[in-house]
Amino acid sequence: MKKKFPEYKGLDLAQVNRDILKIWDKNNTFKRSVRQRNGKGKFIFYEGPPSANGIPGIHHVMARAIKDVVCRYKTQCGYEVKRKAGWDTHGLPVELGVEKALGITKEDIGVKISITDYNNACKKDVMKYTDLWEELTRKMGYWIDMDDPYITYDNRYIETIWWLLKQLYEKGSLYEGY
């Protein structure tokens, strides 16, 4: 015999989500979670950065959910888990989008438009969807420090990568593989 269960029609998951986010905001839950473990073992998480020049999709939600599970697990193990957001700002799609928007080609850079103006247009364009990313981050309850992200076009980031590559080179850890 098939048993019937009544459907609960009063559950508004969107409202539950909003209520939880309000509580987290009011209690500063994310920052308190990190601060309460200050001085314990450290676990630093640098997000493999999304590109802010594209609209976030469901695959980003899935990837971020996995990242968040790892960080929350480490928190439950007693670690002080600092989570650093980042923005990937390099890539051909950014350049092609800016060239199309400006009505120029690669050959026009330095001729019809200065390199500085072109770079500034790319920097502006690549960050155009950060508000959507921040909204998604908040709505999904993904705990990460969005206040001080690393940005791959920032000279500090680039110089750090160069320094790291130099260290690897000097240790003989880099080789040509072709």
Predicted regions mapped to residue ranges:
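N-terminal, positively charged nucleic-acid-binding surface of large information/translation enzymes
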Residues: 1-178
